[in-house]
């Protein structure tokens, strides 16, 4: 059979299921693909196919993630589902699967559980912008008051972590009944309601190419008679010949103008997000720019040295440390293209961090780095990755 061509006709949105173990995340994922395939196109993925999530590596960390796709009338959704709690923690912190929005699955029979809370907190920390709720297993709860109580608890939990709890769509249903084709209110119609909530409550994401220009510096060359060329992969935005840019990070910010854009030794008028490009900079010396800095649209990003982060520490089996670390730990933090030493401070009451833990920490870097909240980094010791983190709050 010929391979189906990827149709780019509908806008593309990345989502995923989060929530406590055994509350029905994978069953709901299967139901979304089944009903999506029947109504709007796409292909049904059965529970077992999703549950056997393949392992993949992100920033040196092995994560099991299932990727499925489904359609709504107006969008194409790429959806991630993880088998285990640890996979969620790793996935969200490394940004292996960026989510424009999440579907929080909570069992109506059990109500919010520890991982329900932890996944909401993680979503806040790593910058998942929107959450829609599916109260699953509604067929196991006969008491309408009990359902209302669980819904209230979930709304309070969302509000506690700065999500709009009162305005969040909460759909009652049974993923299992929907998979069986049940047409009652909590069966197939509940899944259609959920898809509608995704369409309306999760805004279309800004494409990388529409965001302000940013390119991490990978290499710097001096070309006699032409000047200095900086190479890297454009992370976001568009750069045109004649644009003014800033060089940010490590040292004082400098301004310059791009006088040439080249790709594969060809001169172009512009480069855009995703391109590996070389930019020729006016009046810039070879020694003015170094790996670890970024070129960006003036004023769009600032250098910082102190921030809060959410970090996952690799277990011994994953090639991480064999021993815990303590306050004052000074590893290398790898941002974009370079390592920078940072001092680690732990929250009050946390004495040490064990391999396999995830923890909130405060980091002070010895040199400033261009950063926004949501920037991912690796923690390294002597070139090997021992952890992964995400900037959750900039302090200074």
Curated annotation (Swiss-Prot):
Its main location: cytoplasm. It is found in: Cytoplasm. Residues 136-139 are annotated as: G4. GO terms for cellular component: cytosol. The keyword Chloroplast does not apply. It comes from the Bacteria. Residues 81-84 are annotated as: G3. Its EC number is 3.6.5.3. It holds the Pfam family GTP_EFTU. Coiled coil: none annotated. Residues 10-206 form the tr-type G domain. The keyword Phosphoprotein does not apply. Disulfide bonds: none annotated. Keywords: Cytoplasm, Elongation factor, GTP-binding, Hydrolase, Magnesium, Metal-binding, Nucleotide-binding, Protein biosynthesis. It catalyses: GTP + H2O = GDP + phosphate + H(+). Residues 19-26 are annotated as: G1. Residues 60-64 are annotated as: G2. CDD domains: EF_Tu, EFTU_II, EFTU_III. Mg(2+) binds at residue 26. GO terms for molecular function: GTP binding; GTPase activity; guanosine tetraphosphate binding; translation elongation factor activity. Monomer. HAMAP family: EF_Tu_B (MF_00118_B). Belongs to the TRAFAC class translation factor GTPase superfamily. Classic translation factor GTPase family. EF-Tu/EF-1A subfamily. GTP hydrolase that promotes the GTP-dependent binding of aminoacyl-tRNA to the A-site of ribosomes during protein biosynthesis. This is Elongation factor Tu. It comes from Xanthomonas oryzae pv. oryzae (strain KACC10331 / KXO85).
């Amino acid at each position: 059979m010929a391979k189906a061509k990827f149709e780019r006709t509908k806008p593309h949105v990345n989502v995923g299921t989060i929530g406590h173990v055994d509350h029905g995340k994978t069953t709901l994922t299967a139901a979304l693909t089944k009903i999506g395939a029947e109504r709007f196109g796409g292909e049904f993925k059965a529970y077992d196919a999703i549950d056997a999530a393949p392992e993949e590596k992100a920033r040196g960390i092995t994560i099991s993630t299932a990727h499925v796709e489904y359609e709504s009338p107006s969008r194409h959704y790429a959806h991630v589902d993880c088998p285990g709690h640890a996979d969620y923690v790793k996935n969200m912190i490394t940004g292996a699967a960026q989510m424009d929005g999440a579907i929080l699955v909570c069992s109506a029979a059990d109500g919010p559980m520890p991982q329900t809370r932890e996944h909401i907190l993680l979503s806040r920390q790593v910058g998942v912008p929107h959450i829609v709720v599916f109260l699953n297993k509604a067929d196991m709860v006969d008491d309408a008051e009990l359902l209302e109580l669980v819904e209230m608890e979930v709304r309070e939990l969302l509000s506690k972590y700065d999500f709009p709890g009162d305005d969040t769509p909460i759909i009652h249903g049974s993923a299992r009944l929907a998979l069986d084709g049940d047409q009652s209110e909590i069966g197939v119609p509940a899944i259609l309601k959920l898809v509608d909530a995704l369409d309306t409550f999760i805004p279309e994401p800004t494409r990388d190419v529409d965001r302000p220009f940013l390119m991490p510096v990978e290499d710097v060359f001096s070309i006699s008679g032409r000047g200095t060329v900086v190479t890297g992969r454009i992370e976001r935005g568009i750069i045109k010949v004649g644009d003014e840019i800033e060089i940010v990070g490590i040292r004082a910010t400098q301004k310059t103008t791009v006088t040439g854009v080249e790709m594969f030794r060809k001169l172009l008028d512009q480069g855009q997000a995703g391109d590996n490009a070389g930019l020729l900079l006016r009046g810039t010396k070879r020694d003015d720019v170094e790996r670890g800095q970024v070129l960006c649209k003036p004023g769009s990003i600032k250098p910082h040295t102190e921030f809060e982060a959410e970090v996952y520490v690799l277990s011994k089996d994953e090639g991480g440390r064999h021993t815990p670390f303590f306050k004052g730990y000074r590893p290398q933090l790898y941002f974009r293209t370079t390592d920078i030493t940072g001092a680690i401070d732990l929250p009050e009451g946390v004495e040490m961090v064990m391999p396999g833990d995830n923890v909130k920490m405060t980091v002070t870097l010895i040199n400033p780095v261009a950063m926004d909240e949501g920037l991912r980094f690796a923690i390294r010791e002597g070139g090997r990755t021992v952890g992964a983190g995400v900037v959750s709050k900039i302090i200074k």
